[in-house]
A protein has these predicted regions:
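Conserved Rossmann-fold NAD(P)-dependent oxidoreductase catalytic core, especially the SDR/UDP-sugar
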Residues: 86-88, 97-140
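Rossmann-fold NAD(P)-dependent oxidoreductase module
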Residues: 15, 19, 103, 152
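Active-site Tyr-X1-5-Lys
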Residues: 139-166
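N-terminal Rossmann NAD(P)H-binding glycine-rich loop of SDR-like oxidoreductase domains
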Residues: 3-23
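NAD(P)H-binding glycine-rich loop region in Rossmannoid oxidoreductase-like domains
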Residues: 35, 39-99
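SDR active-site strand-loop-helix element
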Residues: 6, 30, 71-72, 114-120, ...
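Residues at the starts of beta-strands that form the adenosine-phosphate
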Residues: 2, 26, 113, 162
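Conserved glycine-rich Rossmann-like NAD(P)H-binding loop of the short-chain dehydrogenase/reductase
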Residues: 25-32
Length: 168
């Protein structure tokens, strides 16, 4: 499969890229730091620069891709949540997702899947038991961030009947 990945140098993306390459998939990584990525990642991975916010030369690869895995986002545990840091956390998810959704909308042969990885923090504090998709949302900054992130994906809900996640 031809898979486009954002956030491929992060906590989830790094190990995932290794597995995808080992499984024989063609990987195109969109990254803010191409030189750093090239020095650390498998040479089979095609690396394309991306500012994480707007469409760029990478959009040509969306046409004909089988899937887009959007793992990009400011580290939520890396710094204190000041007003500026909260804007970075939200913007890194929402702006990039909007650019990806727009590029998918323009593709002649659209990917079958767009996967956005969010976190269990959406559900707030859970004292006991398991958390499933139908669990009530939390009332926190992370819950609101995920709401905005889902909203950025929502245009695809009307164009792709395979979209499984609805607005919370």
């Amino acid at each position: 499969m031809k898979i486009i990945v954002t956030g491929g140098t992060g906590f989830v993306g790094g190990p995932l890229l290794s597995r995808l390459v080992a499984a024989g998939h063609e990987i195109i990584l969109l990254t803010r730091n191409p030189d750093s990525a090239r020095s650390r990642l498998d040479r089979q991975i095609r690396i394309e620069p991306w500012d994480g916010k707007v469409a760029g030369s990478w959009v040509q690869h969306v046409d004909g891709a089988d899937a887009v895995l959007n793992l990009a986002g400011e580290n939520i545990g890396g710094k204190r949540w000041t007003a500026v840091q909260k804007e970075r956390i939200i913007g890194s998810r929402v702006d990039g997702t909007r650019a990806i959704v727009a590029s998918i909308g323009k593709a002649m042969k659209k990917p079958v899947a767009l996967v956005n990885a969010s976190a269990v923090g959406f559900y707030g504090s859970v004292e006991d038991g398991d958390v499933a998709e139908d669990h009530p949302r939390g009332n926190s900054f992370l819950s609101e961030t995920v709401d905005q992130w889902v909203e950025a994906n929502f245009p695809l809900s009307f164009k792709s009947p395979q979209n499984r996640h609805s607005k919370p």
